[in-house]
Structure formats: C-alpha cells, structure tokens
Design a protein with these regions (language model features):
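A short helix-loop-beta-strand connector motif used in the catalytic cores of GNAT acetyltransferases and
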Residues: 43-60, 83, 158-161
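Conserved beta-strand in the GNAT
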Residues: 61, 68-76, 83-88
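Conserved GNAT acetyl-CoA-binding A-motif
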Residues: 110-122
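Conserved GNAT-fold acetyl-CoA-binding loop/helix
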Residues: 19-48
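Conserved catalytic-core motifs of GNAT/GCN5-like acyltransferases
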Residues: 119-123, 130, 134-156
Length: 169
C-alpha cells in the first residue's frame, strides 16, 4: 500500500503501533525492540496529538490492504536537515522491506521540503540497528547526545547515550 501522511485521526493506532515496535512484550517479536533498555511507553496519544499541531512535523504511515497502519516514521524539519525519528514497523512485519520503503519516502519528503540531509539519533549500543542504517547510506557524524528520560515514558535500565547518523539526499 502507499505511504501517506498520517492525520490526527490516526493517533490511537499510531500510538499502539509505535509502542508495540519499541517497548513491552510485543516488541520482542521484532528485532528493533528497546524493551531490554527502557521500561514504560515509547509515546502517548497526547504527545502524538501535539505533533500534528506543529507545522515542522510530518508523520508518514504505511497501511495494509485492510487499512491497518503497519509502519510509520516521524519527520521534523530542522533547518536544512530533516530529522527522522520514531521509525516504527509492526514487529510481525519487520525484515520484509517496509522499513526501506519508509526511509525512501522520508528522503523523497526531504527533497520536496528543500532539505539536503536526513539526520537521526540512535541508542549507541544498538549495534545491529546502526549497521542497518549504515547499509542504507547513513554515517555516524561523531556527535553524541545524552538520552533524556521523561518519567512519563519510563526509566532507563542502564546508562544510555545517543549517536547522530546522517545521510545526504
């Protein structure tokens, strides 16, 4: 199915998808889980609703033939760069190419918005995930950022640091 812009009516389903891809038992069915690193939710509906009120933020979604959202990606214009975050694919569909399609759609949006670079942060000890992004042309910039945990979204089970990855479009 085509990748399109999500709308506020998608918030409940987006919240379920994103949390199932990152946290809790359901996330362990896929390879992108953070459940071993962080407790709690990845996102809540209130925060997602706020994103739709920001003109610099776009959330793309992929739907299956029944209309169910199976993948999503958060995009935020940050000057000449497009930040890619909350990249989510249903744990049951990971490894089938949907992630590559979502990244390609993000690159297309970057060009349309006049951005020349995709940028993202990844937990530094997620080596398999970093390798996946590197195979898709992303490179570590050498920059690191602290991981800020919000009590609303659980606690880190160990110290966490983020690395910045970028790719020209």
């Amino acid at each position: 199915m085509p990748i399109t812009k999500a709308t506020q009516t998608d918030v409940p389903e987006l919240s379920r998808l994103i949390n199932s891809a990152y946290r809790g038992e359901s996330s362990k069915k896929g390879w992108t889980t953070e459940a071993h690193l962080l407790d709690g939710l990845r996102i809540d509906e209130s925060t997602l609703n706020g994103y739709f009120e920001d003109p610099n933020i776009i959330i793309l979604k992929n739907t299956d033939e029944t209309g169910q959202i199976t993948g999503s990606v958060y995009l935020e214009v940050r000057g000449p760069k497009l930040y890619v975050g909350m990249f989510s694919v249903s744990p049951l569909l990971q490894g089938k190419g949907l992630g590559r399609e979502l990244l390609a759609a993000a690159a297309t949006y970057a060009k349309q918005l006049g951005c020349h670079t995709l940028t993202m942060t990844v937990i530094s000890i997620r080596h398999e995930l970093i390798s996946w992004y590197e195979r898709r042309g992303f490179k570590a910039t050498g920059e690191t950022q602290p991981f800020h945990v919000h009590e609303k979204f659980g606690a880190a089970k160990q110290p966490i640091q983020l690395i910045v990855l970028e790719k020209g479009v």
